[in-house]
Amino acid sequence: MRRKPIIIGVTGGSGGGKTSVSRAILDSFPNARIAMIQHDSYYKDQAHLSFEERVKTNYDHPLAFDTDFMIEQLKELLKGRPVDIPVYDYKAHTRSDKTFRQEPQDVIIVEGILVLEDERLRDLMDIKLFVDTDDDIRIIRRIKRDMMERGRSLDSIIEQYTTVVKPMYHQFIEPSKRYADIIVPEGVSNVVAIDLINTKIASILAEIDR
């Protein structure tokens, strides 16, 4: 009987459909002990910087994340202990004062652009997914999301994409594809891939329930 919780890593470029794929997996197991943890929650606290300095941070670089803290909390969850996950304020560009209590689960989905870039994170994962989506689709989705959800201007989004997001994708994110167990072209619309992933998860959950 399997007792250790499983961790599923889901990565891909910004706007590529990582969150949609993760939520599709979550929705497929409504009665299971399953949760999603986002790498974005672990952006470093920048309260000591001015707002102008925070805006200039390269948020697509590994150094923008407190991955050490994420690994520490994932290890606690694997031991069956609850953790308080930080909440990031995208408009203020720093951590908020709030945290989210995450209880231990049988399945933990770890989602983010760089979750396969760090070897220590990869070593915690049982299944690693790379959501592979066309560049044009990703930038359109990013524009819509950042304007509607994060209160950003079109000019700032385009400038960030051309100077930071695109170069970082080719330097860090795309190369991490080689570590993926499964590559999911076109994200959540790839029903066959999602079904295969869900079948694998269901078999693991069955082992836990025995």
Curated annotation (Swiss-Prot):
Listed HAMAP family: Uridine_kinase
GO cellular component terms, A-Z: cytoplasm
Example GO BP: UMP salvage
EC number: 2.7.1.48
Intracellular or extracellular location(s): Cytoplasm
NCBIfam families on file: PRK05480.1 (NF004018), udk (TIGR00235)
UniProtKB keywords: ATP-binding, Cytoplasm, Kinase, Nucleotide-binding, Transferase
UniProt name for this protein: Uridine kinase
Sequence similarity: Belongs to the uridine kinase family.
Pathway: Pyrimidine metabolism; CTP biosynthesis via salvage pathway; CTP from cytidine: step 1/3; Pyrimidine metabolism; UMP biosynthesis via salvage pathway; UMP from uridine: step 1/1
SUPFAM superfamilies: P-loop containing nucleoside triphosphate hydrolases
Listed GO MF terms: ATP binding; cytidine kinase activity; uridine kinase activity
Positions with a binding annotation for ATP: 12-19
Gene: udk
Catalyses which reaction(s): uridine + ATP = UMP + ADP + H(+); cytidine + ATP = CMP + ADP + H(+)
